[in-house]
Each structure stands twice: as structure tokens, then as C-alpha cells.
Amino acid sequence: MSVLPSHLKYADSHEWVYLDEEGHAVVGITDFAQESLGDLMDVHLPEVGADIDQGEEIMSLESVKAASDIFSPLSGEVVAVNTELEDEPERVNDEPYDGGWLFKLAPHDLSEMDDLLSDVDYQGLIDQS
């Protein structure tokens, strides 16, 4: 297990998020989540322009072990997706906090960031798993 990046906020459903320089919320899954899933075979990305609520299912990942729904840590409009994952889903396994990002949102309510976990709190959650 890698050290959790401290600049990210975490959902208890194992997604991470941070705000980029344009104010968009960049979303991915944690190293814990990708390890639990195993080798990814397919990524079903959301549609750009989709409007999503915090905690709502937005996409899915298929691995050699199972299919898993991904939930949005914030409400907002999808403004970008990582299309490189369509040909290289293994990037989520290899670079969960970097090149394996999933999608970007234009967030509707930044106060929702307060609902998310710090790296320390998320580590406590996964230590109980």
C-alpha cells in the first residue's frame, strides 16, 4: 500500500478528489480500491456534460475479479474524461493518483469538500477493513 497523498480528499467509497488550477474537481480511485479490484480490463467513463449529484453512481470499472460502480465525491457537471483509459485501463492500477484519474467535474457546491475525508481519516477507514 502506498502512502496516501495528503493534498487529496477522500470519499468513504474509495474515490479521491482535488481541485485543479482551473477549479475543476479531478476524480480517481484510491490505491486501496484498485488493489481490491485487481487488474482492470475495461473502464466505462461518464459522458461529458452529464450532471451528477454527490454520492451518485457515475461510471463503472471492470476487472478480472468483478465489476465495480464508481460514485461521484462531489456534485457537478462532467467537463472531461480520461479517454486514455479506454485503451489503457491498467493506468488506473499503475498510476491511481496520477495518470489513472477518471474524470473532471465543474463542481456545483464546493462546501461538499467538507463532507470528504482527509488522508489521515481515510487511512483510518481502510485500516479497519
Curated annotation (Swiss-Prot):
SUPFAM superfamilies per UniProt: Single hybrid motif (SSF51230)
Q: Which terms does the UniProt entry file under GO BP?
A: glycine decarboxylation via glycine cleavage system
What does the record note about the cofactor? Binds 1 lipoyl cofactor covalently.
Positions bearing N6-lipoyllysine = 65
| Record-linked PROSITE patterns | BIOTINYL_LIPOYL, LIPOYL
Q: Which organism is it from?
A: Hydrogenovibrio crunogenus (strain DSM 25203 / XCL-2)
GO CC: one term? cytosol
Cited PANTHER family: GLYCINE CLEAVAGE SYSTEM H PROTEIN, GLYCINE CLEAVAGE SYSTEM H PROTEIN-RELATED
The free-text function statement in the UniProt record for this protein reads: The glycine cleavage system catalyzes the degradation of glycine. The H protein shuttles the methylamine group of glycine from the P protein to the T protein.
Domain Lipoyl-binding: where?
A: 24-106
The cofactor named in the record is: (R)-lipoate
Keywords noted in UniProt: Lipoyl
**Assembly and binders:** The glycine cleavage system is composed of four proteins: P, T, L and H.
Descriptive protein name: Glycine cleavage system H protein
Q: Which HAMAP family match?
A: GcvH
- Keyword check for GTP-binding, yes or no: no
What family is this?
Belongs to the GcvH family.
